[in-house]
C-alpha cells in the first residue's frame, strides 16, 4: 500500500512539474513585456499560480519521516486539493483539444460541401444532356418512319401500304428489324438469300400475300407503261403491241390521204366505195401482222 501511494505521488509530482514549467515560461514572457507596459492581471494570476504549484511540489517531495505531527492531519486535505487541481487541468486540456479539432474540421467541411454541390450539379447537367439526346434520337426515329411511309405512299406509284409495316414497327413506336431480332448473327456476314429466307419465315401469310400482290402490281404497271407484246403473263395485258399499233395507224392515215382522189371518183358508185373500204382494212391488218412477226 505504501509503494502504491508512493507511485501515485510520483505521477502527481510529474504532472505538477509539467504544469509548473509551463506557468514559469508564461510568467517569464509576461515579465519581459511588463517592462514596457504596466503589469496586467494575467501576470498577477500567473505569479500566484506559480506560488501554489511550488507549495504542492514541496509537499509531494517530502518524505514520510520528515512530516511533522501537526501536518499529518492536513495531508489528506492537501492531497485532495492537488487531485482536484490536476483534474481541472486535465478537463481544460481536453476542452482545448476538442475546440482545436472542431476548428480544423470546419475548414475541411466547406470544401467537402462545395465538392458535393459541384458533383450534384454535374450529375444534373449529365441527366439533362442525356434526356436531350434521347429526345433528339426519338425525333430522328420519328422522322425516319415518316420518310419511309411517305416514300411508300408517294414515291412508288401504284403500290399500297401493305401489312408488312405493322410487323416492322413495335407497339411502343420503336422500329424493329426482323432480320436482327430473330437471330443474333450479324447481317454483314449473312448472304442475301439467308436474310430473304429469314424475312419470309418471320412474317405472316397474309402479309406475304399482300407483299406479293404489291410486287405484281408494280411489275404489271411498268410493263404497261413501256408497252406490251403478244405473249403470256402481265406483258400480254393489252393483247397487242402498242408500238406496232401506232405504226399501223400512221400507215392507215397515209393510205387515206393517198386514196382521197379515188374516193371522190367513186362517190357515185356505192359498190366501189364498199370495195375500197374493205381493201384498205385488209391492207392495214396484213401490215399489222407483218410488223408483229
From Swiss-Prot:
Chief location bin: nucleus
Molecular functions per Gene Ontology: chromatin DNA binding; transcription coactivator activity
Listed GO CC annotations: nucleus
Location within or outside the cell: Nucleus
The keyword Transcription regulation is assigned to this record: yes
The entry's keywords: Nucleus, Transcription, Transcription regulation
InterPro entries: MED15a/b/c-like
PANTHER family documented for this protein: MEDIATOR OF RNA POLYMERASE II TRANSCRIPTION SUBUNIT 15A-RELATED
Family that this chain belongs to: Belongs to the plant Mediator complex subunit 15 family.
Function text: Component of the Mediator complex, a coactivator involved in the regulated transcription of nearly all RNA polymerase II-dependent genes. Mediator functions as a bridge to convey information from gene-specific regulatory proteins to the basal RNA polymerase II transcription machinery. The Mediator complex, having a compact conformation in its free form, is recruited to promoters by direct interactions with regulatory proteins and serves for the assembly of a functional preinitiation complex with RNA polymerase II and the general transcription factors.
Subunit structure: Component of the Mediator complex.
Protein's name according to its UniProt entry: Probable mediator of RNA polymerase II transcription subunit 15b
Organism, as annotated: Arabidopsis thaliana
Gene name linked to the record: MED15B
Amino acid at each position: 500500500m505504501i509503494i502504491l501511494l508512493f507511485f501515485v505521488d510520483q505521477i502527481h509530482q510529474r504532472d505538477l512539474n509539467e504544469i509548473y514549467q509551463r506557468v514559469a515560461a508564461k510568467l517569464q514572457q509576461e515579465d519581459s513585456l511588463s517592462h514596457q507596459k504596466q503589469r496586467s492581471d494575467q501576470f498577477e494570476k500567473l505569479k500566484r499560480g506559480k506560488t501554489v504549484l511550488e507549495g504542492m511540489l514541496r509537499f509531494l517531495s517530502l518524505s514520510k519521516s520528515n512530516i511533522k505531527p501537526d501536518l499529518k492531519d492536513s495531508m489528506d486535505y492537501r492531497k485532495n486539493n492537488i487531485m482536484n487541481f490536476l483534474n481541472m487541468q486535465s478537463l481544460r486540456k481536453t476542452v482545448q483539444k476538442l475546440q482545436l479539432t472542431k476548428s480544423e474540421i470546419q475548414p475541411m467541411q466547406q470544401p467537402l460541401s462545395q465538392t458535393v454541390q459541384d458533383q450534384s450539379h454535374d450529375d444534373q447537367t449529365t441527366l439533362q444532356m442525356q434526356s436531350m439526346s434521347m429526345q433528339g434520337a426519338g425525333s430522328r426515329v420519328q422522322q425516319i418512319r415518316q420518310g419511309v411511309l411517305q416514300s411508300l405512299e408517294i414515291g412508288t406509284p401504284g403500290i399500297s401500304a401493305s401489312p408488312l409495316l405493322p410487323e416492322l414497327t413495335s407497339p411502343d413506336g420503336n422500329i424493329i428489324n426482323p432480320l436482327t431480332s430473330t437471330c443474333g448473327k450479324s447481317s454483314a456476314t449473312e448472304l442475301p438469300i439467308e436474310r430473304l429466307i429469314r424475312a419470309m419465315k418471320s412474317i405472316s401469310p397474309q402479309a406475304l400475300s399482300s407483299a406479293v400482290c404489291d410486287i405484281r402490281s408494280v411489275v404489271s404497271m411498268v410493263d404497261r407503261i413501256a408497252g406490251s407484246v403478244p405473249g403470256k403473263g402481265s406483258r400480254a395485258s393489252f393483247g397487242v403491241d402498242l408500238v406496232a399499233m401506232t405504226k399501223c395507224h400512221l400507215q392507215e392515215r397515209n393510205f387515206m390521204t393517198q386514196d382521197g382522189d379515188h374516193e371522190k371518183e367513186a362517190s357515185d358508185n356505192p359498190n366501189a366505195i364498199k370495195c375500197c373500204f374493205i381493201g384498205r382494212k385488209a391492207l392495214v391488218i396484213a401490215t399489222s401482222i407483218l410488223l408483229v412477226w
